[in-house]
Each structure stands twice: as structure tokens, then as C-alpha cells.
Amino acid sequence: AWPAHEQYLRMATATPTKVVFLGMNPGPFGMVQTGVPFGEVAAVKGWIGINAPIGKPPREHPKRPVEGLACSRSEVSGRRLWGLFADRFGSAPAFFEDHLVANFCPLAFMEEGGRNRTPDKLPASEAKPLLAACDQYLFETVRILRPDWLVAVGGFAEARAISALAGLEVRIG
């Protein structure tokens, strides 16, 4: 999904930015399909205006195929989040003037049965190095974008932000 993610980053990285909204990690019917955090297909294509090709990964879970922008399943949290921004800002360019939506962890994990496994549910031996790398990624993202606020979408994202961003001048809520 790199072409779509690159398009997203190019439109969403004003510096400094006022607010970064932070989720946990890609959902199977959102960013996994579209390359956009909380990437509800209708919002990505219609409101954000991204229509890039989405390739398949070398290894794909048979119960969670990557269909890209043709995915018919809905990312409910993404529909709500991008719907809120559409109502509040009207247009994607107006939103992206000083806002960004990101994920703490850019990776998706699927259990054997196809269920999404979030980073907080990984075994400690796997989670420790992953969380350290994601903490550094978040720190660098916030250092570069210099937002006034980081709005965490969920308790896990908030806890990681508080831990990772110690020493930076950013309000976390």
C-alpha cells in the first residue's frame, strides 16, 4: 500500500502541525487495505481523494486478503473518525492544513484464525523490541511535526504517547 500511503503523507505533513491524532495500529479493513490510518475505503477514495493502486503483500493471510480500495468491508472506527473530520472541516485540504492522523505502530498482526492482534496483546518477548521501535518512530514523528497537541485514540495509544514523548513540548489528551 506504499503508493497510497505516500500520497497520504504528502498531503498530511504540514510542519509545524497543530494536532496529531494517534491510533494503535492498522486495522484489517482500514489501513491494511488503503495505506491510510483509520482508512475507511469510502473516506479514503471520496473525501481524502486517494485512488492509488494497492499491491498484495508477499505473504497474505487467507482469511484477510488485501483487496485494496475494492474492499467492501467497513473500518467502523475510520468511518466515524474521518466522518467527524469531514463534518468539522468540510474538505480534506482544510483538515490537512494543520492535522495528521497516524498510528503508533505501522504494522498489522493476524492470528492464525484471521483475527487482528493488536500490539498490546503480543507476548512480552515480541512486544518489548516492537514497542521500543514504535516509541522511537513516534518520538521522531512528533519531533519533526512539532504539534501543539497529540490526541490519542484509545488508552493504549495515550499510554505509549506519554511514555515515548517525555521531554517533548506536546500536550497529550
Whereabouts are the PLM-identified features?
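A polyanion-binding, active-site-adjacent surface
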Residues: 1-149, 158-159
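Flexible loop residues that form catalytic
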Residues: 155
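Distinct, well-ordered alpha-helical segments
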Residues: 162-164
